[in-house]
């Protein structure tokens, strides 16, 4: 398990261009191009919910679920099998499993290569 440098960075912007692009503080960026599992936090009487999203084909009705700009990344790890786990303040959680044929996710940082 490998902890990533994006912990404690805030989400500046979330976009959909060639996948789900999460722009973070300090010129860091996560690009997800394979299906992800997004855990939504509980709200009011509604419990937490898991939603599978294909970042290359996000329907209009799922786009509001990706509205967590401003949230701080509280936990960022890569499991030994290549699974990316991201937790955000406010309760959102993203899990991206590896794909044998394509890069499922990429992490870029101006100061990290």
Tell where the protein language model's regions lie, with residue ranges.
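Surface-exposed, interaction-prone regions used to assemble/regulate multi-protein complexes
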Residues: 1-113
């Amino acid at each position: 398990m490998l902890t990533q440098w994006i912990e404690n960075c805030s989400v500046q912007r979330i976009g959909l261009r060639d996948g789900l692009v999460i722009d973070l503080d300090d010129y860091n960026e996560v690009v997800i191009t394979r299906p992800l599992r997004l855990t939504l936090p509980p709200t009011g009487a509604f419990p937490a919910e898991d939603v599978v999203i294909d970042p290359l084909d996000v329907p209009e009705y799922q786009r509001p679920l990706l509205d967590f700009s401003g949230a701080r990344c509280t936990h960022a790890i890569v499991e030994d099998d290549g699974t990316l786990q991201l937790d955000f303040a406010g309760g959102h959680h993203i899990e991206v499993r590896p794909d044998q044929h394509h890069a499922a996710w990429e992490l870029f940082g101006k100061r990290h290569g």
